[in-house]
């Protein structure tokens, strides 16, 4: 594995990320959610892609792709491992979203290219990174109240908003992926909340990928 080459690719790709609002349709008619996991001891990469109507946030379509994992887990290079399955799921969608939430980092990455940014560049769609853990940078401790907010900073640059979306839950790290500003990323996530820790697009993507009860109930209703 030539990490120097991958690192150079990351730096080059990161320079092409658009950190300004460039939505083709604003407000969007459809918002997507994406989640990636691994099966069979990491040998299979599974990507779930969901499509929600906006502003109702009703689930209207989902696709799950499973492919052979193409590279091992290497911290800082996860997007190279995840994007092939994401691309496979994306290509199956009959309707593409106007805005995509990705479970993972956007520019809140040591080389400013998390999976939300990498995938957003690949398919040229506005993306937002919604991550559950910090990858780099520092932030002031949050109060325990829901709605508590702090800027994630690294080398004098704001990379994300750290936002406690729900009481007694760890905060989310919300960042530009591609073609969405940092402040708009936070605003869009806040518009897509329904009382859970995660915004609806990534909550549904996780539910589909993991076969959670909410998704099982949804399937039964569709029959």
Curated annotation (Swiss-Prot):
The alphabetized list of GO BP terms reads:
DNA repair
Question: Which residues does Mg(2+) bind?
Answer: 35, 103
Q: What is its main location?
A: cytoplasm
Q: Does the keyword Cytoplasm belong to this entry?
A: yes
Q: What catalytic activity does the UniProt entry give for this protein?
A: Endonucleolytic cleavage at apurinic or apyrimidinic sites to products with a 5'-phosphate
Required cofactor names: Mg(2+)
UniProt keywords (A-Z) are: Cytoplasm, DNA damage, DNA repair, Endonuclease, Hydrolase, Magnesium, Metal-binding, Nuclease
- Would you tell me the Gene Ontology cellular component terms? cytoplasm
Q: What is its EC number?
A: 3.1.21.7
Identify the Gene3D superfamilies for this entry: archaeoglobus fulgidus dsm 4304 superfamily
- One family from Pfam that matches here is Endonuclease_5
What does the record give under GO molecular function?
deoxyribonuclease V activity; magnesium ion binding; RNA endonuclease activity, producing 5'-phosphomonoesters; single-stranded RNA binding
Subcellular location per the Swiss-Prot or TrEMBL entry:
Cytoplasm
Which EC class is the enzyme in? Answer: hydrolase
Q: Which domain of life is it from?
A: Bacteria
Q: Which NCBIfam families match?
A: PRK11617.1
Q: What does this protein do?
A: DNA repair enzyme involved in the repair of deaminated bases. Selectively cleaves double-stranded DNA at the second phosphodiester bond 3' to a deoxyinosine leaving behind the intact lesion on the nicked DNA.
Protein family per UniProt = Belongs to the endonuclease V family.
Name the chain's protein. Endonuclease V
Per the UniProt record, the source organism is: Salmonella arizonae (strain ATCC BAA-731 / CDC346-86 / RSK2980)
Name of the gene: nfi
